[in-house]
Each structure stands twice: as structure tokens, then as C-alpha cells.
């Protein structure tokens, strides 16, 4: 158990600094790190993460996702990541799913999904020319076609 705790402290050095703090007084990012660390202490075969970037500062998001990538490369466990930031999720995933209204409408290798023109336009903010769109230019869910007919 002590080795597991040291592993968590290695992954999240900030937690070691704050180890005597009450969890409720930790920042949002520190709370997310503590939640992931607590899960890792159980040595799971499947780590499920629901919106790990929600409400966090970009610097903390980067740190958490670097840790997710490192955990994935270790190969000790599978990771199921639910994330609304599609670009970030597809960057770290091997395989991806897109859901609409509770149904899987597209799945495949993450790089194939990220390369799909509809996904680029509707979820990643790219226009037909391949350039990033301004928020005002993005189509607000008025699609030419639906995923499911």
C-alpha cells in the first residue's frame, strides 16, 4: 500500500505537498488528482474517468491528461474516458466513440474519427477548408445529415 501511495505521489507531486490538507479545501484540480489517485490505489484493471477536465484550468488539464497518457502507456489497466472536449480526448485515445442522445453513432480508431470531415466540422471546430472556425461561424447543430437515418 505504501508503494501505491508513492506511485500516486510520483504521478501527482502536488498531492504530496498537500497530503495533510482536508480534501474539501483542495482546488478543483487537486481534487481531481486525489480522485484519480484514490482509484489507482485499488490497482484497477479498468479506470473510468468522467469529464476529468471539467472546470479546470488549462495547465491542470494538461497535467492530468499527461498522467492519463502515462498510465495508458504503462499498460497495467484499460482507461475509459468520457470527455466533452473531443479534440483532447481523441488526442490521447486509441479508440473512440461518439454518442448522440445516448446512442453510439460513430466508433473507430481515434485517428480515423479525428479525420472524419463531419466530426471535424461539428465537434472539432474545423470548416470545410480545414481551417479552424470562429465560434460565430460554427453550425449550431443544423446538420446536412444525421448520423442515424
Listing of model-derived features with the role each one plays in the protein:
Residues 126-149:
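ABC ATPase nucleotide-binding domains
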Residues 62-76:
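Helical segment within the ABC ATPase nucleotide-binding domain
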Residues 22-26, 30:
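Conserved ABC ATPase signature
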Residues 41-45:
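A short, proline-enriched helix->beta-strand linker immediately N-terminal to the Walker B motif
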Residues 95, 107:
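Short, glycine/charged-rich "phosphate-handling" switch motifs in NTP-dependent
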Residues 47-51:
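Catalytic Walker B motif of ABC-type/P-loop ATPase nucleotide-binding domains
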Residues 26, 39-40:
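ABC ATPase signature
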Amino acid at each position: 500500500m505504501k508503494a501505491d501511495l508513492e506511485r500516486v505521489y510520483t504521478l501527482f507531486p502536488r498531492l504530496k505537498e498537500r497530503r495533510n490538507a482536508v480534501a474539501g479545501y483542495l482546488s478543483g484540480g487537486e481534487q481531481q488528482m486525489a480522485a484519480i489517485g484514490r482509484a489507482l490505489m485499488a490497482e484497477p484493471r479498468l479506470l473510468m474517468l468522467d469529464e476529468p477536465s471539467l472546470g479546470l484550468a488549462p495547465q491542470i488539464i494538461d497535467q492530468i491528461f499527461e498522467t492519463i497518457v502515462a498510465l495508458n502507456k504503462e499498460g497495467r489497466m484499460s482507461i475509459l474516458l468520457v470527455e466533452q472536449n473531443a479534440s483532447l480526448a481523441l488526442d490521447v485515445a486509441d479508440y473512440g466513440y461518439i454518442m448522440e442522445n445516448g446512442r453510439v453513432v460513430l466508433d473507430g480508431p481515434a485517428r480515423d474519427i479525428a479525420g472524419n470531415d463531419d466530426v471535424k466540422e461539428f465537434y472539432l471546430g474545423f470548416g470545410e477548408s480545414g481551417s479552424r472556425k470562429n465560434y460565430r461561424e460554427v453550425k449550431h447543430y443544423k446538420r446536412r445529415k444525421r448520423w442515424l437515418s
